[in-house]
Amino acid sequence: MKSVKMLKGEELEIGTTDKHGNQLKQSDFVVAQDDFEGISICQILYNGITKEFVAMNSSGWWIPYQDLSIATEKLDHVIVKEFLGLEKCGAYWGKGNTPFIRMPIEYFNPVEESTLILETLGRRYKDLFTVIENGCWYLTVNKQIYSEERLGVVACLAAIDCARNKV
């Protein structure tokens, strides 16, 4: 019953950080990258099997709690810093010590900001195409195809790959 109460709460801090020291909360999206899977976007969820918070991928695999601090990065920080080229300005994201008052760090969620990310991708790359098929979003950027169940997640996946691999 304790786990049910935890899940109903508001973005519960889970007691660990990502590999850059950012506190992780229930429902946060994180980035994991390795040589085998490449770049993956996972969500912090309570796993009833292991009875702990894990980073769960849409395909069903997860990163266990004890590995979160060494294997994950908060998605919002990766998108803002690496893809949008912004920095922390007090409680806001901004540029050149100028905070963007519509981008408070605490509330910025890149999965919900897919319009901003898709528009930015569209300005940088001429070859941008999206389609939904069998409940899955497919996004093509510069001849590279990305797919996920949520449009916001596939947009973030493409943005991170483009930023890190200079697609």
Whereabouts are the PLM-identified features?
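Secondary-structure transition motif
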Residues: 1-167
